[in-house]
Amino acid sequence: MTSITALLPAPRYPTPGPKMSIFTTNAVSMAKNDSVPKYGSRTDWKPTSQADFNDGGAYPEIHIAQYPRNMGKPGSVSSNAITLKMDASGSADYSLIATQGHAADRHVQTSYDSLIPLRERIDAGTVSLEKPGEEAEQSTALATQAAFDKRLAANDKSGTKNKSDPQYIRYTANSMMGTEGGESQKIIKMVDLPQDPLEPPKFKHTKVPGRPASPPAPILRSPPRKLTAQDQKDWAIPSTVSNWKNQKGFTISLDKRMAADGRGLEDVKVNENFAKFSEVLNQNEKTMRDDIGKRREMQQRVAERQAQEQEEKLRELARRARQEREVGDESKGKEKEADGEDDRGRSRERLRSVSRDGDSDRSLSRSLSASDRSYSRSRSPYESRSRGRSYSRSRSPESRFRGRSDSRSRSPGYELERAAKKRKTERLERKREAERDLRLSKMGTQQKIKQLAKENSRDISERVALGAAQPQKLAGEAQFDSRLFSKSGSLQRGFNEDQYYDKSLFSAQEAVQSIYRPSASGDSVAEDTIDRLETEKRFDVLGKAGKGFEGADGEERDGPVRFVRDEE
């Protein structure tokens, strides 16, 4: 297996070998010194040279004065050299270098074990993590307070000094000018002069100008050399040549233009993976386009099939609705025909009775006319007008020729003609549906969607018949009437907060009923008009017919004219 030094390049500059330190020298000397006996066999042995102390320090079991490395020896020169010590594993303890100059009670982290948390160490069980007691807290607090006081006293800038205790001095007067004062003594009390702590300073401190800065570090440069022609050519930068502007009209050679371009300085190499990548992208795009086209075509077919099925369902529903409507019309027609037969039978009997008894017929006509007149007076103008309109509507061409249709319906040829007409109608409808399907198949997608949307918007009556009419679902603000938001009904409510409605619920309905309901004043005018029209004889000026039609004045007609086929 090759080492890492074989893989590294050779050094460019030779490096001198490291100086052998004192620790290495001592270790070598300790390895070579075998004259020190083992522990427990040093009773008669005494260290005689400094080589005997190279294994550590002094020997405590030998009770003589020992000076390892001449430390503490009388007459020796003091030194700041650190004494080498060994740890429990026998290796040199270099933590003394970090703890040099610090107090003895200061904890300095000097090993890798200090970086490991206490809970993750091997000896975690031996380390006490209990909360300190009151005595330890008190001693720590006192030490901290003393340190603060010492620091504050050192940083006192006011210049005031602490008050000192007064001093008492015994003063004995000397004999002067022939007086005897040796016996007189005084006790003098010496105190400091009180000083105002807010007094401004008496002296002005001026800043001492700083020393001149050290001279800058010298920059070592190689001696100037003369440029060669090759250097000048390498450092030559061609002037800029524009490929778009030439305002002066200079003629620039191609080599200068290419030199100014700068694109020929590097060889451009195009990786062939770009071409492969583009080809793969194009192939994937083509595949995806084909898949999307097939999916779109399939979705279009499914949509067309669903639309066709929906149209078939609607067409079937419409056909059923038409059939039900035709069945209902036929049943109604049959009922009407039966009613007509009954009416005709009753009219024949009435005519026979009238022909047998003319007097009774005249009295019957008078009573009927009187009853009709009284009924017309009791009716409102609105009812009379609606009655007239309904009567005019009932006089349709179909009712005029009811006798002809009844006679035709009873013939077998009419049934065949009706069935042929129905088959023709169904055939035309199927033809129209086939033509419509053909047009839809030839239409494009957009036109087909428009056509389907147009056909879906059927008439509301047809949608109701098909059961496809659905109320429009409103959303947003369209659900509420905006006129309700701008109303303030406090005045109309009488300032009553509990009354939420300002108007009655059926107020509009009462107004509508009052509009379309005839009043008592209008009834009298309408009755007078009806009486005047009934009593007026506007055709008397033309003369009176001498002979009327047979059975014409038997009774008043109250419905449409019905013709009766003569029985052969």
Curated annotation (Swiss-Prot):
Single GO MF descriptor = RNA binding
Pfam families recorded:
SKIP_SNW
Specify whether Transcription is a keyword of the entry.
no
Cytoplasm found in the keyword field: no
* A biological process term (GO) from this entry: mRNA splicing, via spliceosome
Q: Any idea which UniProt keywords this protein has? A: mRNA processing, mRNA splicing, Nucleus, Spliceosome
Q: Where in the cell is it found?
A: Nucleus
Bias-annotated ranges (Basic and acidic residues)? 286-364, 395-419, 426-440, 557-568
Low complexity bias located where? 365-379
Q: Just give the chief location class.
A: nucleus
**Where exactly are the transmembrane stretches of this chain?**
none
Q: Kindly give the InterPro entries that the UniProt entry links to this protein.
A: SKI-int_prot_SKIP, SKI-int_prot_SKIP_SNW-dom
Where are the stretches annotated Disordered? 199-232, 281-449, 545-568
Q: Which residues form a coiled coil?
A: none
Subunit-structure text? Associated with the spliceosome.
| Annotated family | Belongs to the SNW family.
Functional summary from the UniProt entry: Involved in pre-mRNA splicing.
Q: What is this protein called?
A: Pre-mRNA-processing protein 45
Q: Which organism is it from?
A: Yarrowia lipolytica (strain CLIB 122 / E 150) (Yeast)
